[in-house]
Amino acid sequence: MAAKSDGGGVGVGFAQLHNLDEAVGSGGEEDGEPGGGGCGGGGDGSEPGESSSMHICHCCNTSSCYWGCRSACLRSLLGRKPRRSAAADGGDQPLQPPAAPGAGRQPPTPSAARPEPPPPQVERPWLDCLWIVLALLVFFGDVGTDLWLALDYYRKGDYVYFGLTLFFVLVPSLLVQSLSFRWFVQDYTGGGLGAVEGLTSRGPPMMGAGYVHGAARGGPGVRVSPTPGAQRLCRLSVWIWQSVIHLLQMGQVWRYIRTMYLGIQSQRRKEHQRRFYWAMMYEYADVNMLRLLETFLESAPQLVLQLYIMLQKNSAETLPCVSSVTSLMSLAWVLASYHKLLRDSRDDKKSMSYRGAIIQVFWRLFTISSRVISFALFASIFQLYFGIFVVVHWCAMAFWIIHGGTDFCMSKWEEILFNMVVGIVYIFCWFNVKEGRTRYRMFAYYTIVLTENAALTFLWYFYRDPETTDSYAVPALCCVFISFVAGIAMMLLYYGVLHPTGPRAKILASSCCAELLWGIPLPPDVEPMAPEIPGYRGTQVTPTRAVTEQQEDLTADTCLPVFQVRPMGPPTPLGRPYLPEGPLIKIDMPRKRYPAWDAHFVDRRLRRTINILQYVTPTAVGIRYRDGPLLYELLQYESSL
């Protein structure tokens, strides 16, 4: 969700960075403007360190500025207005600060030698904003209807249902807010730059705290470092703000708003769009992980509970139905958003379109609704056996996931805990956790789910009370199986037509037709359209009859079909073929395989180190792991740190 560029500085959206060709720190000019100098101060005359304010807060001296603005926290506390740059005022340009060690400027590449960038993809920035706004609406609708329903149970005197409904709202929310605040503490307290020698919060490396902007050129001197009192006051205000936000259970809302702010800034401020993009991706990944955890701890149990209550009361009131629909929508939306962001975050995978994401929403809606209805029907009669069934299914799925081997976390015990959490997800729906062909695993999973749904539903049907359930027994059976079939149809539509790697239906159709028409595939070493070699015909001698008959028999045995397929060119790589030009930060550890997150998304120590490397190397344009393609090495990160 950062602004993409077609090489001419035209942003067409804030989706992932496929091919940015702006001259970031290259010393060249583009569209008449000097290339951004990053956080070390550049030719734009801005204050030193201002361009990196998303990562280095000027007053807090930290690499995680939670105010999301260019030191506005310090300016508001001290009553200072934003100062215009010297270049904008027509004054003298400040002295260029010395470059960071190992992060020198690269000479501009001649335009004739640079490859032509591909045409920009058609993306609309309002779609990205709308997607986040809809995610916020789904969140408020889910939590709001659950709280409203709990209050309604309390007014009616149903204290048991009130307690259960409120329990499935408050306990998951407290757990998720605690995890979110813990991440904030790790980022805010561990992201300081005091331990980095020669690095200050307002100037580039090796400048020191006494660097005065413009004083060396006779301009007005500006004090770089804020006072210690202002630093303490700003830190205290950040701590109070984040504490209040998380106590009000609004940590995810704040992260959604900050993600949208960073995405908009990445489209508006093209000279620093890479930094805004990285900061936005970190924030968006955090909020999606938190939402995924909360939905399966709160929305999924809440959905089963409300359906169970409606079956016990033998009535479907408006408020429980609305609460169930919003919980179901929250589950489907979070799963689709999670998988879309996961593909967007990896440069070795093509991003998912919004059409594909919407089809995924319907896929999850139908399959989860079929699963939950069968759960509620069975639990309305066999409460004890339903609990045993859920525990057994969770244990079996967790063992299956652990046995398959996943690579999501940084340690073995964290990986086992993650697999146990994914086992909870597998109670309700499919969740891909392993690279490779998923068709066989999905076929096995959905076969098991269909068998379980049918068994639970038919057991309820045969042991139900006909007097109270005849009015909805047959429609309930139809909903279970029709919803499951509709969900599988949506899944096939997604993988067959809207998958990011291309329509699978065309590939399967072409291979099947080739096998039906030819019987066997074309040998790879045969070139039927190859031209004759000059000079070879003149050296031939008239063959004898025996040799001619032998050659005719050989030709008849190896004859090729009349209609042949023209050889295709080299296949298009699955990832993004155009790598960004510029220095790269190398992480000396193997890259995790899809569908796992990259290590710098889940390891917060590594994320903080990358933030510091981005600060000391403002021209860095990408991150490469040890086993990935690398243009050239600039900085290395040892995995033992």
UniProtKB/Swiss-Prot annotation:
It is found in: Cell membrane. Residues 107-120 have a biased composition (Pro residues). It is a multi-pass membrane protein. The chain crosses the membrane at residues 130-150, 159-179, 318-338, 372-392, 413-433, 442-462, 473-493. The keyword Ribosomal protein does not apply. It holds the Pfam family XK-related. GO terms for biological process: apoptotic process involved in development; engulfment of apoptotic cell; phosphatidylserine exposure on apoptotic cell surface. GO terms for cellular component: plasma membrane. Residues 20-47, 84-120 are annotated as: Disordered. Residues 34-46 have a biased composition (Gly residues). Keywords: Cell membrane, Membrane, Transmembrane, Transmembrane helix. It comes from the Eukaryota. InterPro entries: XK-rel (IPR018629), XK-related_scramblase (IPR050895). This is XK-related protein 6.
